[in-house]
Amino acid sequence: TLVHPTSFPGKYGIGDFGQEARIFLDFLEETEQSIWQVLPLTPTGYGNSPYASYSAFAGNPYLISPDILLEKGLLTASETHSLIIPSSTTVAYELAFEKKAAALKLASARFYETLGGDEEEKFERFKLEHGHWLDDYVLFMAVGKSNQMRPWNTWDADIATRKKSAISKAKKTYEQEIKLEYWLQYEF
């Protein structure tokens, strides 16, 4: 069975790993299906294609369910309600991404405000276990977004060629954006 999560019906303009995904998994179990084939679950790049990704390892943050963030206390009911997009036969990528990006940023801030104990331990362990790709990815995304996601070879030459001083400066300049990207991958 080939179904990408973005194809699930949902109220947020694009399918995600929320209730509709759970319903689909239940359906697969009830019908004794043993394989669920998906397109890549990585962040989409140009043209919103899952085959044009910025990473082979990262998860697409737009698959994070606002309803699950509500359950975790990272979004309020009114905030998730404001994300609702009237149903359509096509995905309104730009509108869905715009609304979800703002909500994910807010949820991330709440996550960091309350971070401590076991959750902090799990978060730090996640960063350590995935550091071989995650550290470069979060920096790339933070710098990339500041460059309107233009190709990296059009960025400032020092950061594009990974000069140590430019990397250090970028880590300070984009500290908040980097924190957001770490959380997005942890939450995914």
Which residues make up each language-model segment?
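Acidic/aromatic-lined carbohydrate-recognition and catalytic surfaces
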Residues: 1-188
